[in-house]
Amino acid sequence: MQQQVSLASAAAIWQRRQKSVVRINADTLLTLNEEKLRGVGLSRAKALCALNLAEEVSKGRLNFRKLRHMEDEEVIASLTQIKGIGRWTAEVYLIGALQRPDIWPAADVALMEGIRDILSLDYRPSKKEMFLLARPWRPYRTFAARLTWLHYRQMTNRNAEA
């Protein structure tokens, strides 16, 4: 839910979601419709994505336990087959849920801006440049991403206070 929304907005949506559904799983999510999901703060696209994901799980076409045993690119390929889930979402799932050590979401705007600030660049690096810049951090790019996100958060808080 944090994609393209502020962390504060994501937290507020999550709190409203917790009040609207007692226990969330694929089947309970499928009892809701787009309108109810939008009522807890999800955009239309995110509501439809959540319903698509729930349907895949409910029908047995997506098994999160199996994802744990797949290679990173296999997980990305599996998740991005679901309408509304792109590479960034799959990469963040690999980082957060599967704790994979070498994921670098090169197209992440916060990472790009964090790297721009850390390296004192006059421009936001491209996705290709981000891959090249992160090459020395292999096989631990996830840790570099987490540190860069932390830097970005501190950087944006600092700018907001100025």
Q: Where in this protein do the model-derived segments appear?
A:
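C-terminal accessory module of base-excision DNA glycosylases/AP lyases that mediates lesion recognition
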Residues: 87-162
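Alpha-helical ds-nucleic-acid-binding substructure associated with the helix-hairpin-helix region
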Residues: 5-83, 136
